[in-house]
């Protein structure tokens, strides 16, 4: 059973004595790993923000614009850094593109057209239908595990934070629940569970009684087994987060920030991501989900169709990039220099004229926004045919389309993680590969982004 730690469940564990079976019943993570010599490791980023555009945005209306009779006037097409851009639809992101703060990969291709399958695929870097797909952790869980050794005293948040994850969120797979995504629905008031309704003194008294009563079960290893050990870790983690003003403030934001970021759930997630990264409390991977892109009908309907999601994306991500670029990071860099940002859907949408229902259907070709974390911005890698329907020029050394596994390898490499790692601790006994190696042509970092 794979773990996703909803924030209500997370704090409920700490406030009661119920040891639910939230984690996989497996042995302690083994340390035996192997890697392939010669892997390209960039190590240019400390953090990653991954934005899952659930539903599949129309690439030819956003990151790979094609202007035709279908194009609404208010898209206000323009050219930025020789890139055709819908400036009326995405003005804030257009300004960041003009400031060379992100680039676009236009040669991406999916291997299927099923929402749930591909959304999971993009999070676990493999086909979920394959054998290891059933046990595979989210990329964020891998990052959390790999970065755990770098954790400093006082860094109280889990390594993997999910914002607005919803039903599409992939969990920690066979990894310990310690590396599961901590899923939060952001609010300007923060996380209410950080304080107990009966007050700190009453809570502390009850918590101490709980700890004393469960002491015999909290041995290492526990006589009941690994799941209880890991639930015990949840108690401890949740307790350290409570009644800490630094943690509390990391999840709060002002009305002015809420308005600036678009006054939407996605905007709230983006400003929360900014605050959490600035607080430097141990989070190294943040996944934000923005749905609403499945525009089979009425894609250009005023204030409907593509507009709500595009406006949320523009205000939220555009301001997140701008703010990170203005904030001090490590070693004289900015927070944007420290943070790789990736935004993509599971696939694209059909090109050319719209369908009879006024929309666009699922399509293999799509685009990815990628910036910060050492990426050279202001460019478009790869090129599609004039109708945006096929990859004309892949734009990178592999001379083929870019797949989800390549994006994952790029994320790992940017964070200094060896994407060729094989962990020999999986329940299948076959070795868990961060990127599956049975298809040697998949899973290559995109070097051209960093030059």
Please give the residue ranges for each predicted region.
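Ligand-binding pockets and gating/stacking loops
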Residues: 2-451
């Amino acid at each position: 059973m794979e773990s996703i730690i909803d924030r209500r469940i997370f704090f409920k564990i700490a406030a009661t004595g119920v040891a639910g079976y939230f984690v996989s019943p497996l042995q302690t993570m083994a340390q035996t790993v192997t890697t392939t010599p010669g892997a390209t490791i960039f190590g240019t980023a400390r953090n990653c923000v991954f934005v899952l555009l659930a539903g599949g945005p129309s690439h030819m209306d956003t990151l790979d614009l094609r202007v035709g009779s279908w194009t609404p006037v208010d898209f206000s097409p323009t050219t930025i850094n020789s890139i055709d851009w819908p400036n009326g639809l995405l003005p804030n992101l257009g300004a960041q593109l003009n400031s060379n703060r992100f680039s676009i990969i236009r040669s991406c291709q999916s291997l299927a057209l099923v929402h749930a399958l591909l959304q999971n695929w993009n999070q676990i870097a493999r086909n979920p239908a394959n054998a290891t797909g059933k046990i595979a952790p989210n990329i964020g869980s891998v990052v959390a595990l790999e970065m755990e050794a770098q954790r400093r005293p006082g860094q109280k948040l889990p390594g993997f934070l999910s914002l607005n994850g919803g039903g599409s969120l992939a969990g920690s797979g066979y990894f310990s629940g310690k590396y599961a995504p901590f899923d939060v629905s952001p609010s300007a008031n923060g996380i209410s569970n950080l304080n107990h309704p009966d007050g700190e003194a009453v809570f502390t008294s009850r918590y101490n009684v709980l700890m004393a009563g469960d002491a015999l079960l909290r041995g290492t290893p526990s006589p009941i087994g690994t799941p209880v050990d890991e639930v015990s870790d949840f108690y401890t983690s949740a307790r350290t987060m409570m009644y800490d003003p630094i943690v509390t403030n990391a999840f709060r934001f002002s009305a002015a920030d809420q308005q600036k970021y678009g006054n939407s759930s996605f905007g709230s997630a983006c400003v929360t991501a900014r605050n959490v990264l600035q607080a430097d409390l141990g989070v190294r991977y943040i996944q934000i989900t923005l749905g609403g892109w499945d525009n089979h009908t009425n894609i250009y309907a005023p204030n409907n169709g593509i507009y709500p999601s595009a406006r949320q994306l523009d205000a939220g991500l555009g301001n997140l990039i701008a703010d990170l670029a203005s904030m001090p990071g490590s070693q004289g860099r900015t927070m944007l220099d420290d943070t790789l940002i990736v935004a993509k859907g599971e696939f694209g949408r059909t090109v050319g004229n719209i369908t009879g229902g006024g929309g666009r259907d699922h399509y293999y070709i799509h685009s990815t926004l990628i910036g910060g974390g050492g990426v050279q911005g202001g460019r478009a890698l790869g090129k599609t045919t004039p109708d945006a329907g096929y990859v004309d020029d892949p734009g990178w050394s592999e001379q083929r389309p870019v797949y989800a596994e390549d994006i994952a390898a790029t994320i790992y490499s940017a964070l200094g993680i060896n994407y060729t790692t094989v962990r020999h601790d999986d329940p299948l006994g076959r070795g868990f590969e961060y990127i599956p190696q049975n298809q040697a042509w998949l899973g290559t970092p995109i070097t051209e982004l960093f030059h």
